Curated annotation (Swiss-Prot):
Cytoplasm in keyword set: no
Functional note: Catalyzes two subsequent steps in gluconeogenesis: the aldol condensation of dihydroxyacetone phosphate (DHAP) and glyceraldehyde-3-phosphate (GA3P) to fructose-1,6-bisphosphate (FBP), and the dephosphorylation of FBP to fructose-6-phosphate (F6P).
Entry annotated with the keyword Ribosomal protein: no
Sequence positions that bind Mg(2+) 4: D232
Biological or metabolic pathway of the protein: Carbohydrate biosynthesis; gluconeogenesis
Active site: D11, Y228, K231
Binding site residues for Mg(2+) 3: K231, D232, D233
Species: Metallosphaera sedula (strain ATCC 51363 / DSM 5348 / JCM 9185 / NBRC 15509 / TH2)
Protein name in UniProt: Fructose-1,6-bisphosphate aldolase/phosphatase
Length: 383
């Protein structure tokens, strides 16, 4: 059977600042999705949150970018936003960048990851959802899951994985993508995805039969809106087992609390902290950036689960290390490398401050202006 899993998220307002979704807004979204299930638009659904993001997980048979499915999600977010405004929640409707729905949600603010598959006899999946960071935050764990044999033993042991995987990498600034093969193009792949603010792993395919293995949301709100309107808070769907990473291999990729951009005001680097659903809320310095994982099985278009994947003492040390790194990074205050690099600050109010100070700068005769790099040009696209 062919079925689709759609994970669509948005920040529609939260309690006490950028902290946590209010249960009444989730109840409002639930009413919309329950009606869509009754009408047969979707077959099953699950609603959750990570931090201030409302997450809609829906299964159906309508394929990707289906108008009715996306309109259902839009209606759920709008109804939840109404409740947010009634309760006076913070940043009500923040991620909804348009006033009206127009066919599908692409470019309208919500983050979208959709996996359209021919179901295997057993179809286990993991859905990872992050708060206070951006889509490129999944570059490192996706590389480890699908290309690093030190993380994923199946790359060595499983014959169906031994040929490797294909990585579709998107340049979010130019709107262009390139497909790179692992292991033979591993170094070129790392050359791109090591700049996660620009190059994002969008999809991964098994090289042996071109079967899709993962999909990541790629919406970057500031690039859509032209200003800072909150971090993108990405979602990731990964297929598991039998020719794909085992569940334990997928989770192993998050055992190291690596640094990601986002955190406070979307302007700081901090460690990603994998947590249980009950701890999925932003606290210290609006973070540290949180990650939850839910495990499901898909059968005949319906969802069995979830399992709260990080609700386990095996990740206690990861969380402890993330807390130590949090403390270390915070001691830098407004200085880099805690604060993001200038190119990533362009969509904050920092350029306004610099413009205000411009008249006070004066030319120093004994200092030459830097020459442009010979390795870059005004047009950095790959035409």
């Amino acid at each position: 059977m062919r079925s689709t899993v759609s994970v669509i998220k948005a920040d529609i307002g939260s309690l006490a600042g950028h902290h946590v979704v209010h249960p009444d807004t989730m109840a409002a979204a639930n009413r919309v999705l329950a009606e869509a299930k009754r009408q047969g638009i979707i077959l099953d659904y699950y609603i959750t949150n990570v931090g201030d993001d409302l997450e809609l997980i829906m299964s159906h048979t309508r394929g990707e970018l289906d108008t009715k499915v996306h309109e259902t999600a839009w209606d759920a977010f709008k109804e939840a936003t109404k409740v947010s405004k009634e309760l006076g929640l913070y940043a009500a409707g923040q991620d909804l960048l348009s006033d009206s729905f127009s066919g599908n949600l692409k470019g309208m603010g919500p983050g979208i990851a959709e996996l359209d598959i021919e179901e295997r006899p057993s179809e286990p999946i993991a859905i990872f959802m992050a708060d206070k960071t951006e889509p490129g935050a999944f570059n490192l764990p996706l590389y480890k899951m699908f290309a690093d044999p030190f993380n994923t033993a199946g790359l060595v042991i499983d014959p169906t994985m031994n040929e490797g995987f294909k990585f579709e990498v998107l340049d979010v600034y130019e709107g262009q993508s390139v497909v790179l093969n692992s292991p033979e193009e591993m170094y070129s792949l790392l050359g791109l995805i090591g700049t996660p603010a620009r190059y994002v792993i969008r999809r991964v395919y098994r090289k042996a039969d071109n079967m899709i293995g993962s999909v990541t949301s790629i919406e970057r709100l500031n690039l859509i809106a032209g200003k800072y309107v909150g971090k993108d808070d990405p979602v990731l769907i990964v297929r598991l087992q039998h020719g794909f990473p085992a569940l334990g291999e997928a989770l192993e990729a998050f055992s190291f609390p690596y640094l990601v951009p986002g955190w406070m005001r979307g302007s700081h680097y901090g460690p990603i902290m994998p947590v249980s659903q009950r701890d999925a809320k932003a606290t210290r310095f609006d973070g540290p950036p949180r990650l939850i994982g839910l495990g499901f099985n898909v059968k005949n278009g319906k969802l069995t689960g979830p399992s709260d994947l990080f609700d386990d003492p095996a990740f206690d040390e990861t969380r402890r290390m993330a807390s130590v790194i949090t403390d270390y990074m915070r001691r830098h205050g407004p200085f880099m490398p805690h604060r993001l690099e200038p190119t990533e600050m362009e969509y904050t109010t920092l350029p306004t401050l610099i413009e205000k100070l411009k008249p006070r700068f004066k030319k120093e005769e004994d200092v030459k202006k830097a020459k442009p790099s010979v390795y870059t040009s005004k047009d950095q696209g790959m035409d």
